[in-house]
Amino acid sequence: MEQTPQATDFLTPAPAEQPWQRPDPEWYKDSVFYEVLVRAFYDPDGTGSGTLKGLEEKLDYLQWLGVDCLWIPPFYDSPLRDGGYDIRDFRKVLPEFGTVEDFVSLIDAAHKRGIRIITDFPINHTSDSHAWFQASRTDPDGEYGDYYVWTDDPEQYAGTRIIFIDTEESNWTWDPVRKQYFWHRFFSHPV
């Protein structure tokens, strides 16, 4: 049975036929970066949204432009209430963009052209629909109970700057399920 690639698979060493060399830690200084929003870049099948496969189809063009590194903002499974930064599942790709296999294929194709890929991977918060947050809400003493910051006192850390003052009144939001306030640094839906 074929296994589905996982996000951690990208951290494994190169195949044995490619001798490992310590990468130049300053490679980025002379690189041409290109930020690409998957949704807006190239729609290969007329659905109205770009895909990882569409991005892969255009790698030769990006290489021709002189791009050395693609910077891809979040493309993970998300309810998209914060531009994809509110990740529901770090191990899945947003279905409209493709699959994990599509991402693996993109990485392989980019590397064959000497193009690096970096991604935004916001691990300091999740979507409020993430399984960890839902478990934290319903089982304070469970495995995920302390994955988030909860309090009975919304004045705790009162001096902390509110980043989005136009939309958020506090860094704390009341949760009627747990009957406590949860801490968030951005919007209340990516917690």
Which stretches of residues belong to each language-model region?
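Acidic/aromatic-lined carbohydrate-recognition and catalytic surfaces
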Residues: 2-191
